[in-house]
Each structure stands twice: as structure tokens, then as C-alpha cells.
Amino acid sequence: MNNKTTLSVANPALHRKKSIVLAAGGTGGHLFPALALAEEFEDTDIDVHLITDLRCKKYLPANHQIEPHIFDFHLKMTGLANKVISLWRLSNVCIKTLLLIGRLKPDIIIGFGGYTSFPSLLAARVLRIPFIVQEQNCFLGKSNRLFAKSARIIALSYKETSNVSIYDNRKVVITGDLVRSSIRNLPIKNTFDNEEFRLFIFGGSQGAKVFSQIIPEAITELLKLNPGLKIHITQQVSQDDQKELSTIYYQLGIKYLLSPFFHNMAEIYSETDLVISRSGASTVAELVNVGVPAIFIPFPYAMEDHQYFNAMAIENSKAGWCFRQEDLTAHILAQKIYELVANRTMLKEASKSLLNRKNNGAKYLADTVLKIIE
């Protein structure tokens, strides 16, 4: 009698850890939503890989649990020689990314738009890995449009995004903004009745210079319209402009704080009545989460004018105000600030409308990812 014992050997593939790849970079506006999504997987056994570029390496938090893969995506598409070099460099990155993703074998790839997501989404198509495109702006960018047809899901931060093909609408999910917990948990602005009107002005890395020119003129005119106004200005300025602005504000007799960069954003937001800023995705998402209304001056050279579409989505929901840079004068800006100072109810209503847009988009998208890979 043969008493052989048959051993059951588990299939290692059935017990392989799940993994995802996030492809984001170029600017913080593309990277920060990816970091927000990565946070949602920190307490899971899912491995999170990030494919990004050298420029965005500095944005990675010190305590992150992400496996970063950093490539040189420096592209310069002006002049024939630069275009040839950039296309060669992009081709090289595409090959390296294809080999990397082939080795990682992720269960899904999420691309956050911009040229840095292109190689990863291309690899996903070649290797037949399911992927999601996520658009944090109110206008579907080139890279996301290119891959939308093949994507499993098109995740949008704005319900107002209108340039999605009618054939792709069935794949659209509206997540809302993807923001990191450090932003999502900022205190909400709850009063606009302080005697001192507090203005926070920042232009980001793309355009603080023009603000340094037009804001002082507008404030000078504002104080002529309302001589007794108590105002405090917190403004992001370059080192080159700091001395000149300091002199102007000092002569106007107003309180001010000038700096090239601010680390205490939570404190500043909690004390601010009105923001004047660009309308990049990250800026708008922060203001939505804290409920601080803004006058938006979109960066006029943003890719496909997406900052204008972001700002108009906010204005159309009565949550802020938008002025194109080429149409804005110190007089127009002074008149608008004067109107808002005189009628604080407008600020309160705008704040409520902003907060109505607030949700946890990162969790929503994380749940969507889990449904696909599990």
C-alpha cells in the first residue's frame, strides 16, 4: 500500500504584495495630489512607487513612505537643437521607465498629468497594465487627453472640466481636490469682522514680480478711497523687490510683512480676510480647504491657460473673483478690494461657497484604486 502524502504548494503570485505606481512631477501642482493619494496607502500593505523628476525631488516630505524613482525630465522645446536634445532625452526616459515598470510589475499606474506622466502611461499601455489619469486642473491637459481613451478611470478634481471627449464621459469620476492631510486639517476661516483688514498676497514661483508692481499702486489708491482703513498686508516678494515695497508700505503708514517664502501658512490663512494670488491647482485646493476667498490673477503663460479655467470655475460658483493679468489695473484692483472691505458679507458668502467644494478627494480616489486592484 502506497501512503504518499501530497503537498500543496501555494502559488506565490496569489500572495504577492500589491503595488501601485504614481507618475507625477514637473511642478508641485502635479506632485502634491500624488503625495496626497500616497498618504492614503501608508497604513496598508500596498507598496507605493513614485516616478518623478529632479525638480520635484525637493517636495518629497522627509518622513514619506514612498519608493521614489527620479529621472531627468529637463525638456526645452525652444529652438531646433533644444527640441532634438529634448526628444532624445524623453525617448531615453521612456525606455528606462518601460524597463522599470516591467520590473516592478505594478497592479495599477496613476498618472497626474504633465510631461512626467507620459513615459509611465505609455509603459502602462505597452505592458497592458490598467491605469488612471487624474486631472487636478479645470482643463484636461495634453498628456491626460492623449491617454484618456485607454484609461480605466478619468479622475477629475473639478466637476466643471468640460474638455473631456463625449466618448470618455462614462469613465469619469469626480473626486474633488486631492490634498495632503497637512492642508486638509488646516483650521477653517470663521470670521471676517475684524476691524483690521488682513490681505495675503502671493504669486508663487511664476509671477510674484507683477504683483510687486501693481499691488502697491492699488493699496495707495485704496487708502485714498478709504483713508481710515486699518489694513495689514502679508506679501510674498523677491529679495530684489523687498526694500522698495517696504519703503512704499512704510510711507503709507500700514502694517506689513514681506518675505520671499512663508512657512507658517496655517497661521496666515487663519488670520487672512482676502487673498490675492495665482490660480494653480494647489493654491486653489488650499483655499477651498480653509475657506479663504481670493481675487485670482491667473498666470497668463500657464499651459493651455489652465489657471484661467481654474479661477473661472471658482468665480462661477460665487466663491472668488477672477481678473486676467492683461486686463487688470491698479484702479480696478483697488475698486474691488474697496467693495469687499465695505461689504464683508460678500467675503462670508464666498467662504461658504468655497467650503461647499471641500471633500476628501484623496480617499475617494484611493477607494477607487482598491476596487480595481483587489
Regions found by a protein language model. Give the residues of each.
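C-terminal alpha-helical cap of glycosyltransferases
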Residues: 2-6, 339, 359-374
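Conserved donor-nucleotide binding/catalytic region of nucleotide-linked donor-dependent transferases
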Residues: 321, 326-360
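Active-site-proximal region of nucleotide-activated glycan assembly enzymes
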Residues: 47, 55, 125-186
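An amphipathic, basic-hydrophobic alpha-helix
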Residues: 79-108, 126
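Donor-nucleotide binding loops and adjacent catalytic segments primarily
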Residues: 42, 49-51, 56-64, 187-274, ...
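A short, glycine/small-residue-rich beta-strand->loop->alpha-helix junction that serves as a flexible
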Residues: 22-35, 56, 209
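Conserved nucleotide-sugar phosphate-binding/catalytic loop shared by glycosyltransferases and other
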Residues: 16-25, 42-89, 239-241, 324-326
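Acidic donor-binding loop of glycosyltransferase active sites
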Residues: 106-108, 270-285, 292-293
